[in-house]
């Protein structure tokens, strides 16, 4: 029997019933290699499909060892549950996080403006509590956080575009409160109307293609 040092100490958060479950086994296996072999990680990118699809290892290779922990469909309140496993135990110098757009899809089911307003307020509370918890965990682990704005969208209802503006104001305010850098992708990717993503930067109005990612790199 071959003994692997520290394998029994690996944090495996389990399944939450969200999209993250689809990559949980993969990330546990990848995390075990980094954790047990004490690979020095410089940056972890945490987020949803926009992070998942981004070739961050190539874009940021000059900064050292870069790890992508993006999951398609990720939401803010589930990112909290895997932060210890996918960020803290990897001991990166920096964590770059962008998450929140997927919390908004539930708004499509609202039948009245009053119902949507109530649900928007609930989502804002989720953002607030989730970001605060992640920032607290990062501070305790002495990991520098870079918090990114939610990117703009195209071909989506107007209410979602306006809600993203509101969400980003909260995220920016939390960054200021906690003295954490706020990375403003939003304003860099806007069309001339000031609220919609520049159509030429995205495949589908949500996910950037190379043009969008090149802007995000800068």
Residue ranges of each PLM-predicted region?
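N-terminal secretory targeting modules
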Residues: 1-46, 53-56, 61, 90, ...
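Alpha-helical cap/lid subdomain in secreted, periplasmic
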Residues: 59-65, 74, 80-218
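Short, acidic Gly/Pro/Ser/Thr-rich loop/turn segments
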Residues: 51-53, 190
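Active-site metal-binding loops of divalent metal-dependent hydrolases
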Residues: 49, 71, 101
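Hydrophobic residues at beta-strand termini and immediately following loops
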Residues: 46, 69, 183-185
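N-terminal post-signal-peptidase region of extra-cytosolic proteins
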Residues: 29-31, 78-81
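Short substrate-entry loop that stabilizes the transition state in hydrolases
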Residues: 53, 75-76
